[in-house]
Amino acid sequence: MTAHSFALPVIIFTTFWGLIGIAGPWFVPKGPNRGVIITMLVATAVCCYLFWLIAILAQLNPLFGPQLKNETIWYVRFLWE
């Protein structure tokens, strides 16, 4: 269940930002700044995708867990039983 719940957002966001970065430049009108607009569009798609990917991967495998004192652990255990 976890692999499926992780794979679906990755596929959706990869497709979304891929379409913006690859298909978006096709719709930029011709003009003197066309190259700049295409560069900005592709750079924005890449940066937003990488920001999202790094954030989701950091949540998937955190470097450290919550730091609890022994008293807190015993109190939570007492309340949950």
UniProtKB/Swiss-Prot annotation:
InterPro entries per the UniProt record, alphabetical: ATPase_V0-cplx_e1/e2_su (IPR008389), ATPase_V0-cplx_e1/e2_su_met (IPR017385)
Hydrolase in keyword set: no
Topology with respect to the bilayer: Multi-pass membrane protein
A Pfam family of this chain: ATP_synt_H
Primary localisation category: membrane
Keywords: Cytoplasmic vesicle, Glycoprotein, Hydrogen ion transport, Ion transport, Membrane, Synapse, Transmembrane, Transmembrane helix, Transport
Subcellular location: Membrane; Cytoplasmic vesicle, Clathrin-coated vesicle membrane; Cytoplasmic vesicle, Secretory vesicle, Synaptic vesicle membrane
Metal-binding listed as a keyword: no
Residue numbers on the Cytoplasmic membrane side: 29-35
Membrane-side (Lumenal) residue stretches: 1-7, 57-81
GO biological processes: proton transmembrane transport; synaptic vesicle lumen acidification; transmembrane transport
Residues modified by glycosylation: 70
Molecular function as annotated in GO: proton-transporting ATPase activity, rotational mechanism
Function (record text): Subunit of the V0 complex of vacuolar(H+)-ATPase (V-ATPase), a multisubunit enzyme composed of a peripheral complex (V1) that hydrolyzes ATP and a membrane integral complex (V0) that translocates protons. V-ATPase is responsible for acidifying and maintaining the pH of intracellular compartments and in some cell types, is targeted to the plasma membrane, where it is responsible for acidifying the extracellular environment.
Subunit and interaction comment: V-ATPase is a heteromultimeric enzyme made up of two complexes: the ATP-hydrolytic V1 complex and the proton translocation V0 complex. The V1 complex consists of three catalytic AB heterodimers that form a heterohexamer, three peripheral stalks each consisting of EG heterodimers, one central rotor including subunits D and F, and the regulatory subunits C and H. The proton translocation complex V0 consists of the proton transport subunit a, a ring of proteolipid subunits c9c'', rotary subunit d, subunits e and f, and the accessory subunits ATP6AP1/Ac45 and ATP6AP2/PRR.
Protein name in UniProt: V-type proton ATPase subunit e 2
Organism of origin: Rattus norvegicus
Classification of source organism: Eukaryota, Metazoa, Chordata, Craniata, Vertebrata
